[in-house]
Amino acid sequence: MLHVLRQLSAGEESIVSDPQVASITPELDQAAHRRLAVELFNFVWTLIEKADRTAAEIDQMIHAAHASCHHWGHAGTNANLGRGEWQIARVYAVLGRAEPARWHAARCLAYVETAIGAGEADDWDLAAAYEGLARAEAVAGAAAESARWRAMATDALGAIADPADREIIEGDLAAIPR
């Protein structure tokens, strides 16, 4: 197996002759990508909410969050990609990993801003993006930056029409360590 990895990494032709077996992933239609994105997103939430994750579950949570976002890239809007990046940032924040949490929270905001410009965003996307940045900064120990993003998220709550949506983000904001 190591020989195969070396051969492939050197750019040599694959020793697998069947193109179906040799392909990394089969072609999926948009519906399949969307279904996988949603299912993986929901699976990640079960692991985020689990108090006593094993090392294997932590790995699953990280990989599934990235995979969900990957599939949104094939079948979603900028808003979907922003939500995927938000979830990845949340995963890393839960794990106390500030650098990737910051990276993905910033990517979330960029996608959400693009989605707003394209008319694709829901009224809660901006507040959620700001919440993700506030959480990432809190994990990094940057209290002033976290407070700045938290204030922006709080201001953005006023744009959310559905009280249930607003309450979810208010709860997320309240749970951010100070």
Regions found by a protein language model. Give the residues of each.
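Flexible helix-coil transition and linker loops at the boundaries of alpha-helical arrays
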Residues: 27-31, 71-76, 113-122
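Helix-turn-helix repeat elements of alpha-solenoid scaffolds
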Residues: 18, 55-67, 98-107
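Amphipathic alpha-helical segments of tetratricopeptide repeats
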Residues: 66-70, 107-117, 151-162
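"A position-specific structural signal for the A-helix of alpha-solenoid helical repeats
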Residues: 42, 87, 125, 132, ...
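Structural signature of alpha-solenoid helical repeat junctions
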Residues: 35, 57-60, 80, 100, ...
